[in-house]
């Protein structure tokens, strides 16, 4: 297993644990962007989408409150910068967002 694959596995395991502790049931965790395409640089951040039914009917502020501290814990454990995005399953399945479409087309599902 490559170093990148090990890191993705670690990210998945860490996020699963952090989300469970927050009472969030993730349906899917997707890495997209440069890490998914294999063109990351040393200073690249890791782009991640977390999809959960628990984000349905929640504003961006409510989602931030639910997920507070997850990014900080992930950075502490992995030692890389992250960009975490949180979407409901309805948004993931029905959105025409460029970010969601990019993640669906070129991302890598690491959980779910």
Which stretches of residues belong to each language-model region?
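Short beta-strand->loop micro-motif that forms the acidic, two-metal-ion catalytic signature
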Residues: 47-50
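Glycine-rich beta-strand-to-loop/alpha-helix junction loops that act as flexible
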Residues: 32-34
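Catalytic core of pol beta-like nucleotidyltransferases
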Residues: 1-28, 37-42, 52-112
């Amino acid at each position: 297993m490559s170093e990148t694959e090990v890191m993705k596995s670690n990210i998945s395991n860490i996020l699963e644990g952090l989300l469970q502790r927050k009472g969030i049931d993730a349906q899917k965790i997707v890495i997209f962007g440069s890490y998914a395409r294999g063109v990351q640089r040393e200073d690249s951040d890791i782009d991640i989408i977390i999809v959960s039914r628990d984000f349905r009917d929640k504003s961006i502020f409510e989602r931030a409150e639910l997920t507070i501290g997850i990014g900080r814990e992930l950075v502490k454990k992995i030692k890389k910068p992250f960009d975490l995005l949180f979407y409901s399953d309805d948004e993931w399945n029905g959105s025409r967002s460029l970010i969601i479409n990019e993640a669906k087309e070129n991302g890598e599902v690491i959980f779910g």
